[in-house]
């Protein structure tokens, strides 16, 4: 029996920030169901695919009833009766149906929900895990980066840098690495509490204390790592995401950072000093604005052989924009966010480009998440090498890490059989 798409149904659900988002069910003729929920970002690149929201009085203008209607109407009509096993064909059908460069007519949130749900339905129909359906048999778990201190637009902490992350560079297994991070997370919480600082968490599950500066935050991470019994730089490394587009003045061409106005050259000097002072700092994401390609390229020339420099807002997971970045020598790694581009196929294309150009890849969640663990399977399938999906708090973050534990068991043949 030939299996085809029988029904596609979208609904409005809520994400981890209390905002509406799109969830899609794809039902196949063999009775198989694939379900996917779409995340949403707070710090977004200007050239991201368009998240369609209604903009009216309902739900602060953020409702997604138009995107839902587009799935249940046009997209369903275009895809019904199609085989679910040709992901690229179906994704390109939706891209053509939308007819815009940035998916603004149907909405990237509508298209991505269907794209992800189709992949999951196809995997379920084949009775294999999603990571194996997307990636075949040659698979590996990524190195996880945990956002344990939140700043920027993700928290009201007074720190300009948006994310301070830790990663287990020395680990026997994914579980071993996760346990190390859990130990540091709880140690960090105690250190903050002992200092009388806030231990409430931000959007991504990290703490949001008013530490005053980037250096204070990094020094506090060093303290937590050491007090938990690990060696900074040797066992546990640090990464930051300044999300510098958020504090860049495009008119003055300066960065409003920690009470100062810094030129691109001055900000680069600051980053150089930071890496020299804190050698456990191995990765900087979006150190320069998406509108400051020259600044980003200069950083890559100076620091690109020493540390990882990740492009997020500057590339927005868009293969065409990324090609330009490769040609101009911008960054040495790319962040992959499915909802920045709007289809599984285009995200895979960006990863393929990175591999050919010698760039590293890091899969990422968004600040507005759901309990959908699609990106965990996707990271394993794509040999992404790295992932960041929040801290060790908030179920929508931890669910991705728990999915890696399940996948690790399966890959090691440790799962319970009945």
From Swiss-Prot:
Pfam families attached to this UniProt entry: Enolase_C, Enolase_N
Keywords: Cytoplasm, Glycolysis, Lyase, Magnesium, Metal-binding, Secreted
Organism superkingdom: Bacteria
Residues involved in Mg(2+) binding: 241, 285, 312
Primary location: cytoplasm
Cofactors required: Mg(2+)
Pathway assigned in UniProt: Carbohydrate degradation; glycolysis; pyruvate from D-glyceraldehyde 3-phosphate: step 4/5
Record bears the keyword Glycoprotein: no
Transmembrane intervals: none
Location(s), subcellular: Cytoplasm; Secreted; Cell surface
Protein name: Enolase 1
Annotated source species: Lactococcus lactis subsp. cremoris (strain SK11)
Primary gene name: eno1
